[in-house]
Amino acid sequence: MKMIQVLGTSSDSGKSTLATAFCRILKDLGYRVSPFKAVNMSLNSIAIKDGSEIARAQWVQAMAAGAEPSAYMNPVLLKPEGHHKSQVIILGRSIGSMGINDYYNYINKNAKIIKESIDFLSNKYDVIISEGAGSPAEINLAGRDFANIYVSSLYNTPAILVADIDRGGVFASIYGTINLMQRSDLLKYYIINKMRGDQSLLYPGIERIEELTGKKCLGIVPYIDLKLPGEDSLDYNFSGSGSIGIVRYPYMENYSDFDPLIFNEKAFYIKNKEDLKRCDVIILPGSKDVFHDLEYINSNGIADSIKRCSGEKMIIGICGGYQMLGKRINDASGVESDGVSIPGLGLLDIETYYNKTKTTGSVKYRFAENQLKINGSGTGYEIHYGSIVKNNEMPLLITDHGPEGSVSSNGMVIGTNVHGILENNEFYRYITGEYLDYDNIIENSIETLAGIVKKSINIEGFLELLNDA
C-alpha cells in the first residue's frame, strides 16, 4: 500500500488545498488516487450518490483525483452543534449527537473503522493522499488524536508538514511542531505555503531548520487566489460588495452553497437589520440549530425586517432557512429542541415537522412550472431532519420523489431543501442576471492549483515518497 500523509502546523495552513493538488498531480501521472481524511470536523458536508454524508473537502479531492466519492474517504465526520456537542457521522451515517467525552470513548473502541477504511481504499487505488486535521503537535490530545499520527503510524506512512507563512512565525511553527509531535521520524519534508514576495528571504531559515531538525524543505508554494469550496467557516470570512445578502446566524452550515456567489463577489453577510438595506436578494442559509438561529434573528430585529421586505426583495431559504420561512416548525421528538413547536416567519404557507430519521442523498431535479418560469434540470443533495409536511405553495422543483420546495404566489419568496441549487446555471442566472459554469470554474481551479504546486515543489522528492510508503 502506498500512502502519503499531509500534516499541518495549524488549522487553515493549507493541508486540504495541497492534498487536492497532490491528488491531481498523481492522477495526471497515471496513478489511481484516493483522498482520505480519518476525522474531519466541518459543517461543510455533501451527500453523495449512495446517500452517505462526507466532508465537502474530500469530495473536492475526489474530483481532483478522478475518483468516485466514498464514505471510506472520510470515515468520521463531526458536525458541531453547539452546547459542547457534535453530530457524529460514521461511514456516512449519523449515529447521533455526542459530547467530547462520549465521542472519545466511542472512537477509542471503534478506531478500527479508520484502518478498515484505509484497507478498503488501498485495495482499490494505487495511492492514498491522507490529510491530517489541525496539527499533530496538540500535546493536550496525545493518545486521543486519531486524525494525524495515529494514521501515519498504522503503516509507517511518510508525511509532509504544511506551514502557513501568511500568518507569520513560520519557522517557529515548523520547529515547534517537529519537536512536539510524536513519530517525527515519519516526517520527511515540510512545505512553506502561501508565500508572498521574494522567496530568497527564506533561504537562511530553511538552512537553519535543516541543521536543527534534519528535515528538508520540499518547496515554497506561493499564495494562490483559488475558487474552490472551503473546508469550514474559517474559509468563509469574506466581506463582499454585491447586492445579495446572506443572513449570518451563529449555527449557519453548508457555507459552500454560496461559493458561486462568493467566487463572483455577488454576496455579503447580513449581520444586522441595517445590512438588509444594501441587498436586492436575501438568502437564509442552512442551520445546524434552526430553533436557536430563528430565535437569534427574531431577537435582533432581522426577522421583522425580512418580513417588511417581503414583496419588495427576493427572499430565498435553503434547508434550515427554508424551514424558517414557513408558518410553523414542530419538533415533538426533540431532535433539535426540547420538543417545542415554534412559529416561523410566515412568508411561505408550509409547516415543518422534525423526526429522528435523517434524510441524506443526492437529488436529480427539473424546475417545476411556476411563476419563475425557469427551465432546465440539475443535481443537488439533501441533508436534513426536518420534513415539509404541509405545503400549500407551488413547488420549485420536481424530483424523482415528487414535488420539492416552494414558490410564493408573487414569486418573491422561494424555498428548497436541495443544497447546491445555486450551482445550477439557470437558477444562478435567474437571481443574478449572469451566466455561471460552476463545474468548469472548479475544474480550472484544480488544474491551476496542481500546475503551480508541481512547479513549486521538488517533484522528484515527492514521488520518491511513494517508494517509502
UniProtKB/Swiss-Prot annotation:
GATase cobBQ-type domain segment(s): 241-427
Any one Gene Ontology BP term: cobalamin biosynthetic process
S-adenosyl-L-methionine in keyword set: no
Pathways per UniProt: Cofactor biosynthesis; adenosylcobalamin biosynthesis
Positions of the catalytic residues: 319 (nucleophile), 419
Keywords, comma-separated and alphabetical: Cobalamin biosynthesis, Glutamine amidotransferase
UniProt superkingdom: Archaea
Transmembrane recorded as keyword: no
GO molecular function, one term: ABC-type vitamin B12 transporter activity
Family: Belongs to the CobB/CobQ family. CobQ subfamily.
Protein name as annotated: Probable cobyric acid synthase
PANTHER family assigned to the protein according to its UniProt record, in alphabetical order: COBYRIC ACID SYNTHASE, DETHIOBIOTIN SYNTHETASE
Function in brief: Catalyzes amidations at positions B, D, E, and G on adenosylcobyrinic A,C-diamide. NH(2) groups are provided by glutamine, and one molecule of ATP is hydrogenolyzed for each amidation.
Organism for this UniProt entry: Picrophilus torridus (strain ATCC 700027 / DSM 9790 / JCM 10055 / NBRC 100828 / KAW 2/3)
Gene encoding the protein: cobQ
NCBIfam families: cobQ, PRK00784.1
